[in-house]
Amino acid sequence: MPGKLNDRVAIVTAGGAGIGAATARRFAAEGAAVVVADLSGTRAQAVTEEINSAGGRAAFIKIDAADPEAIQATIKLAIDSYGRLDVMFNNAGMAVVSPIHDTTLESWNRVMAVTLTSTFLGIKYSVPIMRKQGGGAIINTASISGMHGDYGMASYNAAKAGVINLTRAAALENAKHKIRVNCVCPGGINTRVAQVLGGDRAEEFRRTMGAAHPVGRMGEPEEIANTVTFLASDEASFITGAKIVVDGGVSAHTGMPPFLSSKA
């Protein structure tokens, strides 16, 4: 039985771990050829070898997703290797924990570059190819942190909010060219980012973050990959300009203390 992405070609940035790696594997399982791009060539190669060993098709490239030449090289690799580009998953991002008054301009600019500029570049350079081919799908990783504020993460909040509105603008510009552009907004996901944010209290961070979700746990990378795969497929043919929230119910909450929860 053909997969949802049979014979399509996809690029996944930050594809060497977490959501990116899970999505690269899922894309390949659904029949796509995948270019895995990551700042860590070692991680990108490992995911690629795993896909190829399982009978899929994948290539890898070491890139800084905030570098325009690197994004162009990634797209060139996809076309040279597989002949086309059908799906662009702009997944690169980073967070720095710092209150605004302590955030350096260098730190601010780097978060913007890796999180927002990389998404802009992925759209900018994939759109001409997709227009020439007659269509495609672009999915961007935003976050519930782009919908709400967090303590000490202003640069990340601003960058992810930018990803959401960039998604909308790109969707409007490209709808008539049969290019769908959507973003996914994860809640707390069990990736190595949780380790980084939690530092030496990573396990406590995971427990606290999990308890903050109405479903009682953090999400898994594969659960985001499921949504991204849907958005990349023809099953989402009438969806563009959307932000799809996958957060275990966190954003459904007003912030009111759960004093009435026993009556629910």
Residue positions per predicted region:
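Substrate-binding pocket helix/loop in short-chain dehydrogenase/reductase
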Residues: 99-100, 107-112, 205, 209
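Residue(s) in the substrate-gating loop at a strand-loop-helix junction
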Residues: 143
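Active-site helix of classical SDR
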Residues: 123, 159, 167
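Active-site loop immediately N-terminal to the catalytic Tyr-X3-Lys motif
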Residues: 98-101, 148-154, 176-177, 216, ...
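C-terminal helical subdomain
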Residues: 183, 203-235, 239, 246-248
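Short, small/polar-rich loop/turn modules that mediate ligand/substrate recognition or access, typified
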Residues: 89, 175, 180, 239-241
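Alpha-helical segment proximal to the catalytic Tyr-Lys
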Residues: 128, 172-176, 237
